[in-house]
């Protein structure tokens, strides 16, 4: 069993007109970035006016960073404050404050992830099963067919890609395939790293799987009732999972023990009412967002 934790309602962020699909914490800051079905890319500073509490009303105002022409499925922080965004229609945008958005069209299938690869390139996963590599100037460097179905998630610094073939692929720094193995069935939707460097995956089968670097299964947990959409690891030793079953769960990143369930039963007025699609940590604060259009912030403590 892991150490007991306490989860308190901190605040909620409202303004998106459709479901939220992506969250990002900007490095070394209290700022999170959100994006979703309305195409809006929004910045929220959780520490702008000091600690924010639920009572009486949400008091963090979002700042529109960019309005894109179609739903945004993924975000990545680039160099020097640049934000990268991938869309439903195969567009990758490079967003720089004070400048017009730049973009490259990679096809017509959705962009499900953008990740910094081991060699510094930018890896992009497409619904077509293609893995695309770009440089920081949006120049196309390479593209290859990896899966027969969508590529859904990536740990770029480890060379790992998961997808709707139910597989995890391991590639080298140059993008050459080293190995692959079966994981969540039929689809792997999210990947994370635990405290020991093992791989954690979640997917349509609602299972959390802990695997070694070679794909050997170490632990398997029926973590949720429905599809697991998101995983987020904390430097403080926690792993959060978010699911179509409307719950967020917090696990011990060291041993996989379940520490807390966040749902409408325990938090009647603040738990998610629809699918949870995205998660990110800001220190002890956990941000969760989904189809109810609201970003909910939770304070986690021991």
Locate predicted features.
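Intrinsically disordered, low-complexity acidic/Ser/Thr/Pro-rich linker and tail segments
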Residues: 1-22, 30-31, 37-42, 47-73, ...
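A structural motif specific to WD40 beta-propellers
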Residues: 8-10, 52-53, 101-102, 141-142, ...
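WD40/WD-repeat beta-propeller blade N-cap
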Residues: 13-20, 56-72, 105-111, 144-151, ...
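Hydrophobic core register within WD40 beta-propeller blades
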Residues: 23, 75, 114-115, 153-154, ...
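Conserved strand-to-loop turn within each blade of WD40 beta-propeller repeats
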Residues: 35-38, 86-89, 125-128, 162-165, ...
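WD40-repeat beta-propellers
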Residues: 41-45, 93-95, 134, 169-171, ...
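Blade-level signature of beta-propeller repeat domains, shared across WD40, Kelch, NHL, RCC1
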Residues: 275-302
């Amino acid at each position: 069993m892991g150490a007991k934790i306490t989860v308190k309602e901190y605040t909620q962020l409202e303004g998106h007109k459709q479901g939220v699909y992506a969250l990002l914490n900007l490095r070394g800051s209290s700022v999170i970035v959100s994006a979703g079905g309305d195409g809006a890319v929004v910045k929220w500073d959780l520490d702008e006016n000091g600690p924010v509490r639920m009572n009486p009303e949400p008091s963090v105002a979002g700042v529109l960073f960019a309005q894109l022409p179609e739903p945004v499925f993924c975000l990545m922080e680039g160099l020097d404050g640049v934000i990268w965004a991938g869309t439903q229609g195969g567009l990758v945008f490079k967003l720089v404050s004070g400048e017009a958005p730049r973009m490259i069209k990679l096809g017509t299938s959705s962009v499900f992830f953008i990740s910094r690869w081991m060699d510094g390139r930018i890896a992009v996963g497409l619904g077509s099963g293609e893995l695309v590599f770009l440089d920081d100037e949006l120049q196309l460097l390479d593209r290859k067919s990896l899966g027969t179905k969508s590529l859904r998630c990536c740990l770029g610094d480890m060379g790992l890609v998961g997808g709707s073939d139910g597989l995890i692929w391991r590639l080298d720094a140059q993008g050459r395939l080293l190995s692959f193995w079966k994981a969540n069935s039929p689809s792997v939707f999210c990947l994370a790293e635990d405290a020991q460097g093992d791989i954690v995956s979640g997917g349509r089968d609602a299972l959390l799987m802990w695997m070694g670097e070679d794909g050997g299964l170490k632990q398997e947990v029926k973590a949720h009732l429905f599809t697991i959409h998101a995983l987020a690891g904390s430097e403080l030793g926690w792993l959060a999972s978010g699911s179509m079953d409307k719950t967020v769960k917090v696990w011990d990143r060291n041993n996989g023990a379940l520490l807390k369930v966040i749902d409408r039963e325990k938090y009647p007025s603040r738990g998610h009412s629809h699918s949870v699609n995205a998660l990110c940590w800001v220190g002890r604060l956990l941000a969760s967002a989904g189809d109810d259009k609201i970003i909910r912030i939770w304070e986690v403590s021991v």
